[in-house]
A protein has these predicted regions:
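N-terminal leader/targeting segments and the immediately adjacent pre-domain N-terminus
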Residues: 1-87, 103-117, 149, 207-214, ...
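Hydrophobic (often cysteine-bearing) scaffold residues that line and stabilize catalytic clefts
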Residues: 30, 34, 89, 93, ...
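Active-site-proximal loop and beta-strand segments within enzyme catalytic domains
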Residues: 50-54, 62, 76-196
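Short beta-strand scaffold segments in enzyme catalytic cores
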Residues: 57-60, 317, 340
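Short, surface-exposed loop or secondary-structure junction motifs
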Residues: 67, 135-334
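Short clusters of small/polar residues that mark proteolytic maturation junctions
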Residues: 71-73, 241, 338, 358
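A short acidic/small-residue loop/turn micro-motif
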Residues: 74-77, 262, 361-362
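Structured C-terminal helix/loop/strand segments within mature extracytoplasmic catalytic/sensor domains
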Residues: 331-380
Length: 380
């Protein structure tokens, strides 16, 4: 049996329905059910033969209340995981990049090459020089919106790396941008393709726009800190490569690390955080502290169509249900696998969140575990 680490944060909420809003109770029995589900997930012998990750940290929120946050297993040799353990969060970074881009538009920043106010429909021709290959008569114009919704049709560089750069080595962001300018859109116009290219480019858009608007410092990392991290009250969230500090989960690799060097994953997968900070992020986003109502509506709108009932919004996958909508994203970078999801009830202010962080790559089933934890929170 795995050692269960840290302290559960248990809030007892009355079951009630007031003014159409639902509140859910959280009890010691529910906390025990969570422990049982996670212990089963982390069991050493799995039917598919997959090894469990050494550590898992989670946070569960109900209507903006943190009802459970704790860690399981070993963050590193001799150190138990907790809700404060810091992990690389991989593609959960895209949620922050999307919010920062929407915030920049709200602030009235202007496009560098035209001087027009930034908008979702601003074309890349108004931001970058030398992107003529991105815009041909046969292809729709690549815009901020098409990057956010992954419908730009630009190839995903982590699937097909540019020929002149080494996926196992470092690459400066300006050089990678120059290589991406040589690409041409492919595929059915406006079709969805999961794309780290899009979110790397969004980070470059933020920097280019801020530099042209004489913002100081222009770095997209500094802007995300000021516009998102600080506003959400996140104290252990930052970027890969910075001074790590205490409490980091040691990574466990199941494959040779690629795209792990700077600046491959800028904007798409270069952030670190912990479970309680990501709950704080979910809460700040859902309560309007990061972006305004219209931007939030755009973020959670049906963007690129992924499947019959699944879309990609802006930094989140969107699944429409009969009673609840699910906004979610997974993350997978060398040494870490993560998952963050928000469950929003139709025609109600009620929402739930589940965050799961692990310190091994190639981990499967976090989405299914999150579904089980949502069922516990809803009393199902």
């Amino acid at each position: 049996m795995h050692v269960l680490a840290s302290i559960a944060v248990i809030a007892i909420l009355e079951i009630s329905r007031i003014g159409g809003a639902w509140a859910f109770d959280w009890t010691a029995e529910k906390a025990a059910r969570v422990d049982a589900l996670v212990s089963h997930y982390l069991r050493p012998q799995r039917l598919n033969g997959e090894r469990p990750p050494p550590a898992l940290s989670l946070a569960i929120g109900v209507d903006g209340n943190l009802v459970l946050a704790k860690g399981y297993g070993q963050a590193s040799a001799g150190t138990q995981a907790s809700e404060h353990t810091v992990y690389h969060i991989g593609s959960l970074t895209k949620q922050f990049t999307a919010a920062a881009m929407l915030r920049l538009i709200e602030e009235g920043a202007r496009a560098p090459l035209t001087g027009a106010p930034m908008a979702l429909e601003t074309p890349m021709l108004a931001i970058f020089e030398g992107v003529e290959r991105w815009n041909t008569p046969e292809e729709p114009t690549i815009t901020v919106r098409s990057l956010l919704t992954m419908t730009s049709n630009l190839p995903n560089f982590t699937r097909r790396p540019p020929p002149n750069v080494d996926p196992w080595g470092a690459v400066p962001a300006p050089r990678l941008l120059d290589e991406l300018k040589k690409l041409s859109p492919t595929g059915w116009p406006h079709s969805f393709e999961y794309s780290n290219t899009s979110y790397f480019l969004l980070a470059q858009v933020i920097e280019t726009v801020r530099r042209a608007n004489h913002a100081s410092p222009p770095s997209y990392r500094d802007y995300i800190r000021a516009a998102v991290i600080d506003k959400a009250g996140m104290t252990r969230t930052g970027f890969v490569g910075e001074q790590p500090g205490p409490g980091y989960a040691r990574p466990h690799y199941r494959r040779r690390p690629a795209f792990a060097q700077p600046d491959w994953l800028n904007g798409s997968g270069d952030m670190v955080s912990n479970a309680v900070d990501l709950f704080a992020w979910n809460k700040a986003l859902m309560t309007g502290r990061i972006i305004g109502p219209e931007s939030l509506k755009a973020m959670f709108a049906d963007g690129g169509r992924v499947g019959p009932v699944t879309y990609y919004g802006m930094g989140w996958f969107i699944d429409r249900g009969s009673t609840w909508d699910v906004f979610s994203h997974s993350g997978s970078v060398p040494g870490y696998t993560t998952y963050n999801a928000i469950l929003k009830r139709h025609n109600s202010a009620s929402w739930l969140s589940v965050t799961l962080l692990t310190n091994a790559d190639g981990v499967e089933g976090l989405d299914a575990l999150a579904d089980d934890l949502f069922d516990v929170a809803r009393g199902e």
